C-alpha cells in the first residue's frame, strides 16, 4: 500500500512540469522576410521558421510572461507582448518577434499592460493575417 502511494505521488509530481518556459530573448532567433501581400495590399514581415525552431517549438506546451494587449475587448481578443503597449510592436517600437496572439480556452477579462503568465500550445504561423506565433488553448497561470 505504501509503495503504491509513493509511486502515485512520484507520477503526479511530474504532471505540473510538462510545459517549458519560453523567453522573449529566445524569440529573437526568428528571422523575417518582408513580402508584399496582395490581400492586404501592404508589405508584411513573414517569419522564416528553421527546421530546428519548428522541431523545438511548434505544437509544444509553453509558459511565458508578458504584457496583455487588448485588441478587441468585446470579442476577448488579446495579444501578449514583451513590452508595455507604449513601446510594443503595434506602436512601431518593437519587432514582430516581441508579440504573440493569445487564443484562450475560455473568455477572460484583461486590461492593457496587465502583466500575466500564460500557458498554451505554440502554433508557428506564416500567414500575413496573423501574428507569427499564436498561443492556442491559453490559460492564465495564477
Describe every region a protein language model picked out.
Residues 6-7, 17:
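Short hydrophobic transmembrane-like helices used for membrane targeting/insertion
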Residues 1-4:
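Positively charged n-region of N-terminal signal peptides that target proteins for export
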Residues 13-15:
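N-terminal signal peptide c-region/cleavage motif recognized by signal peptidases
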Residues 18-142:
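OB-fold and OB-like single-stranded nucleic-acid-recognition modules
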